[in-house]
Regions:
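Extended polysaccharide-engagement surfaces of secreted carbohydrate-active enzymes
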Residues: 1-391
Length: 391
């Protein structure tokens, strides 16, 4: 809501928040009100936009803000190519349900005082999922505000088509926890459920991120590792290394949900975008097959009027293991038309050339001692300087 921007602006004399609030009021509020299905509507309820507005707070341009920001509590990394209107924007998240502090303190209060504070139906089960937009045009998408969530509604990593213990329910995380508690009894540990970020590095335009989320998958799957490593340089491209390790054999899947429809190419897929087409290629340590399908997501906007629905179409491209595997690595590569990026994968090493730089990404064997596979990144700039990163 706009009122939140104005409250932050007034409370902290924050000119950035004031600029955002004014921008939404002038450019987007009328359109949102016209499209809203909630009665009586957002304009009759906009009292706080008036009460919290402080005209003495001066707007401040965004140019002095960083292009990368990591929010530790949520395990959320947000990236921008610039603060211009045509900027590319990317975010990825991996953490405890509701955030680390809420998860930790909620269980403490439940144990000490017997009060159940958990209500996570608005918190999406989307560890390692990501969102990308360019110049205000969305590439990836998700289910939005949907009452009952399915595993492939987000750009997550699936094991035998599953992500959590429960699915097709309103509160996926807490329903899954209830099932887990029934199975494990007193052995259930809240600390072992959810995900965490094991590495974040931002050096200039280079951003590297690694999240681990094996804890959310059903116990009987015996997942030892489900990791995603992100590498990007100023959002001129982005790469994922998706890593699966288990004591059992499974079919693993990487999901790519998008607004534009993917078009098959000789190598990979092309996504037509007004702001510049995107090329998508997947390499894997084991044979794969792909599936394309549409998801029709129907959301009830308010329980007061359940016939007022929001319908969303998601184009899904799923890359799956061809046969069950105990371990498998997928490299996902996103490059842009006109960038002349070159991508190949040889002997387990992903090799990308872009803007005169060379990026080499390798994944080693699973290390039971640390609970994950070693990942190494080598970046050579302008054919000379080389930097190495252990992730």
């Amino acid at each position: 809501p706009v009122c939140v921007y104005y409250k932050v602006a007034a409370e902290y004399r924050n000119g950035h928040a004031q600029k955002l609030g004014n921008m939404v009021v002038k450019e987007f509020l009328a359109q949102e009100a016209a499209n809203s299905k909630v009665k009586p509507g957002i304009l009759p309820e906009a009292i706080f936009e008036f009460l919290w507005y402080d005209p003495s707070v001066e707007e401040r341009e965004f140019d002095d803000l960083p292009l990368a920001r990591y929010f530790e509590d949520l395990g959320l990394l947000a990236l921008r190519s610039s603060w211009q209107r045509d900027a590319r924007v990317f975010s990825i998240k991996c953490g405890a349900p509701g955030g680390a502090k809420q998860w930790r303190e909620g269980w403490k209060i439940l144990q000490d005082e017997g009060i159940d504070l958990f209500s996570l139906s608005h918190h999406h089960p989307d560890n390692l999922s990501y969102i990308f937009a360019s110049g205000g045009e969305y590439f990836t998408c998700e289910d939005g505000y949907n009452r009952n969530l399915m595993p492939d509604n987000h750009n997550v990593l699936l094991v035998d088509g599953r992500y959590t213990d429960a699915q097709d329910v309103n509160d996926v995380y807490m329903t899954s926890v209830e099932q887990r508690q029934k199975e494990e009894g007193k052995d259930f540990s809240p600390e072992s459920y959810g995900g965490f970020v094991s590495c974040v590095k931002v050096e200039g335009n280079l951003a590297v991120y690694r999240g681990e989320t094996a804890g959310v998958y059903p116990r009987h799957m015996q997942m030892q590792e489900v990791s995603r490593v992100l590498v990007t340089d100023g959002l001129g491209f982005w790469l994922f290394a998706d890593i699966f390790n288990s004591q059992k054999s499974h079919i693993y899947s990487v999901i790519c949900n998008t607004d534009p429809l993917p078009c098959p190419q000789e190598k990979g897929y092309r996504y037509p975008m007004e702001t510049g087409d995107i090329r998508y290629q997947v390499f894997s340590s084991a044979p794969t097959e792909t599936r394309q399908y549409e998801q029709q997501v129907v959301s009830v906007m308010t329980t007061q009027e359940q016939d007022k629905l929001c319908r969303t179409c998601i184009h899904t491209l799923s890359t799956d293991s061809q046969t069950p595997q105990t371990s498998q690595v997928f490299f996902e590569c996103f490059t842009f038309a006109g960038s002349e990026a070159k991508v190949c994968c040889q002997q387990g090493m992903l090799h990308l050339e872009w803007n005169g730089n060379v990026y080499k990404l390798t994944v080693g064997e699973y290390d039971a001692g640390v609970g994950r596979s070693p990942v190494r990144l080598r970046v050579t700039r302008d054919g000379a300087e080389t930097a190495e990163y252990s992730l």
